Amino acid sequence: MKPTLISVLVIIFILRGTRAQRVTQPEKLLSVFKGAPVELKCNYSYSGSPELFWYVQYSRQRLQLLLRHISRESIKGFTADLNKGETSFHLKKPFAQEEDSAMYYCALS
């Protein structure tokens, strides 16, 4: 079985007013086998009430919104739950597919 390559890029700093915000994604590159579960980690620091997003960019395509923390939907099999206690917004999918190969961006506003 050929591994599916899932790339992760970090959007590091966004500033609003005087409060500094930051998102971090520990994995810069992630390879998983087709059919295997995948989890892309996103941790954040923010002193207010965060709005978190996952964006995806497929090869030769524009950046598109995948998920927002308020939607609680499953899009293309992906889900993400906002955990304020752990300050995380991890993107998960139970079974990776070849078409999931893309760049994934976690963003904070």
UniProtKB/Swiss-Prot annotation:
GO biological process: adaptive immune response
One Gene Ontology cellular component annotation held by this UniProt entry: T cell receptor complex
InterPro entries: Ig-like_dom, Ig-like_dom_sf, Ig-like_fold, Ig_V-set, TCR_variable_region
This protein's UniProt keywords: Adaptive immunity, Cell membrane, Disulfide bond, Glycoprotein, Immunity, Immunoglobulin domain, Membrane, Receptor, Signal, T cell receptor
Domain Ig-like positions: 21-109
Signal peptide range: 1-20
Subcellular locations according to the entry: Cell membrane
Glycosylation sites noted in the Swiss-Prot or TrEMBL record: 43
Main location as per UniProt: membrane
Disulfide-bonded cysteines: 42-106
Top-level division of the source organism's lineage: Eukaryota
SUBUNIT field: Alpha-beta TR is a heterodimer composed of an alpha and beta chain; disulfide-linked. The alpha-beta TR is associated with the transmembrane signaling CD3 coreceptor proteins to form the TR-CD3 (TcR or TCR). The assembly of alpha-beta TR heterodimers with CD3 occurs in the endoplasmic reticulum where a single alpha-beta TR heterodimer associates with one CD3D-CD3E heterodimer, one CD3G-CD3E heterodimer and one CD247 homodimer forming a stable octameric structure. CD3D-CD3E and CD3G-CD3E heterodimers preferentially associate with TR alpha and TR beta chains, respectively.
Function, in words: V region of the variable domain of T cell receptor (TR) alpha chain that participates in the antigen recognition. Alpha-beta T cell receptors are antigen specific receptors which are essential to the immune response and are present on the cell surface of T lymphocytes. Recognize peptide-major histocompatibility (MH) (pMH) complexes that are displayed by antigen presenting cells (APC), a prerequisite for efficient T cell adaptive immunity against pathogens.
Entry-linked PANTHER family: T CELL RECEPTOR ALPHA VARIABLE 16, T-CELL RECEPTOR ALPHA CHAIN V REGION
The protein's name: T cell receptor alpha variable 16
Source organism of the structure: Homo sapiens (Human)
